[in-house]
Amino acid sequence: MGLKCLYKENGDSVTILRCYGEYGRIVLPESINGKKVTELGDYIFSEDMRHKPEGKIWTENGTSEERCADENTAACGSRVREICLPSTIKKIGRYAFYNCYSLKKLAMFSTAVDIGAGAFNGCRQIDELTIG
């Protein structure tokens, strides 16, 4: 199964709310349906998401689905080892990477100027942080 993202549109931009896939390396897209991905939602990669947000599903092959992805394949917690954020990201939501114990590598850009409270709480294994 390839990467799937639960997202919502905010006018001319997109917020990714949750990711799904059965592998530890996640490369987020720069755009979905022609709109720039500018935000990561609260608890996006955390196993402790309080409630599942509403949105549409985008798939890696470029299609959109209306149905919800299976939460058992959510890319969260110890399943996540490496994340590459696109240069279009401006905001990282609260507790976005909360308790991602196995996260070792994070690549992001200096365009991410709004990082929510507790975004990296519990990320004890990060040994490579790349900021472009």
Features from the language model and the residues they span:
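Structural signature of tandem-repeat unit edges
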Residues: 2-12, 20-38, 50-91, 101-114, ...
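Short secondary-structure subsegments characteristic of cysteine-rich extracellular domains
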Residues: 44, 48-49
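Consensus positions within tandem repeat domains that build extended binding/scaffold surfaces
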Residues: 43, 93-96, 116-121
